[in-house]
Amino acid sequence: MQTQSRGKLLVIGVLLSFLSGCGVLAVGGVAATASVMADRRSPGVQAIDKGLELEADSALSKRFGSSAHINVNSFNQKVLLTGEVKNDEIKNQAAEYVKSLKNVRSVFNQLIIGPNSSYAARANDSYLGSKVKTQMIFTEKLPSNSMDIVVEADNVYMLGILTQSEADLAKKVASNTNGVKEVFAFFDIISDAEKARLEKLGKAEETQPTSPSKFQ
């Protein structure tokens, strides 16, 4: 059991080491290279998303304490709430609070009523999440760095900025990952023309890091 846990942690550690750029991962004894495309959010929106996550997570933890286990994920100013709460009142209050925050475009309230998940269950979700992300990274034509993937109770929740074909492929990859029960996608769908524009902007930002993206 301890060996299996160490193995899971190793997989997660290796994955996280190259999620932000290009990396090499040994799969089945063969080294494979993963190329991660640039984030399609502007630097400003990325900062807003991080701020929303920190603000909401801190406030909800202080307000509800052990009565709730709430995960807050924001992507392109759309906020996803997952986890467990004691009752409908807390579930609704959590969503209403997040909706009231400045810069929040929408809230996806996926909280369930029930006891807080165990640490073992959360560790399993982390491991399953690493498997899904690895599959995304090694799937051609999937912009894994323009997606946020959350796993809760073996269910996969996805946020991101994708074309329709990319979104369909992402849902297929997640659904086919062993251990996944159900997949929920909350994507911003863009056209191929917008995709090309954002990728061009991303390449320009690599040479001029301080230049803001036009995509908001």
What residue spans do the PLM features occupy?
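N-terminal targeting leaders
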Residues: 2-7, 13-16, 21-216
